[in-house]
Amino acid sequence: MTRRLKAAIIGSGNIGTDLMIKILRHGKHIDMAAMVGIDPKSDGLARAARLGVATTYEGVAGLIRLPVFADIDFVFDATSAGAHVENDALLRAAKPGIRLVDLTPAAIGPYCIPVVNGDAHLDALNVNMVTCGGQATIPMVAAVSRVARVHYAEIVASIASKSAGPGTRANIDEFTETTAKAIEAVGGATKGKAIIVMNPAEPPLIMRDTVYTLSQPADEEAIAESVERMVAAVQAYVPGYRLKQKVQFDRIDSPLRIPGVGDALKGLKTSIFLEVEGAAHYLPAYAGNLDIMTSAALRTAEHMAQRMLADATVSA
């Protein structure tokens, strides 16, 4: 049997519970060991207990006191940006070498988009999964960037209001700031901008994302092909990720002024329209925004664990 590394999840809300179900069903190198919350009556903690997972409602302090903590190598943090800073400090003091996968916009560690730069951070002690909008759209910005220099990229992430829990709502500013920075740092754009829309429609609509880039003039077919290859790569761990329609192009011949970028920009505008349907492991299918976050987090941790296990085998 393949050896697996034990993991804990901090945050027993929508994201944490969905991630737990994914690990229990699909974990190859990661084993679900503990669920951490602060509400003793939360559905996530109750569900974890029924599934035989160790639980605590006393936060990170409670996790550290659990007997299983001695065996835990990974912690997924699905709380909030502010809480993650404190959680990282407490865990690092208790176990300096523990790996944290941050599903909040705190961004203590490097930004990680599995299909773009996941392999660059396999040895990092803390990696940041950016945001749901970032996980959905930054691969598209990167797909354009590998064909032509991107001066500016703007993304609009539309999610069902019902899929946005208190953690998401408390982090709106951090969402836009972290996503914009990651569009630049990981996506390769000179300047990035992010907008989130919470759609109150009933019945709830699945996640939809729009990506606009302004790049140097380039071969449109090459960009379209690059986008399609990137979509296929994301679908390897998020099957519900897909293009809503063909990539659209517009030649910009009149100079544009983009603050922070330049005053006389011309080039190629690329418009990419996406939708993300969730796998419905715990949450409804319309919550593709949460599904892509938990899927990306597990993908990242699996690759990190695989590296750790391989290194341990070599050392032995």
Curated annotation (Swiss-Prot):
GO terms for molecular function: acetaldehyde dehydrogenase (acetylating) activity; NAD binding. It holds the Pfam family AcetDehyd-dimer. It comes from the Bacteria. The keyword Phosphoprotein does not apply. NAD(+) binds at S12, G13, N14, I15, S163, A164, G165, P166, G167, T168, R169, A170, N171, N289. Its EC number is 1.2.1.10. Keywords: Aromatic hydrocarbons catabolism, NAD, Oxidoreductase. GO terms for biological process: catabolic process. It catalyses: acetaldehyde + NAD(+) + CoA = acetyl-CoA + NADH + H(+). The active site is at C132. Coiled coil: none annotated. Belongs to the acetaldehyde dehydrogenase family. NCBIfam families: ac_ald_DH_ac, PRK08300.1. HAMAP family: Ac_ald_DH_ac. This is Acetaldehyde dehydrogenase.
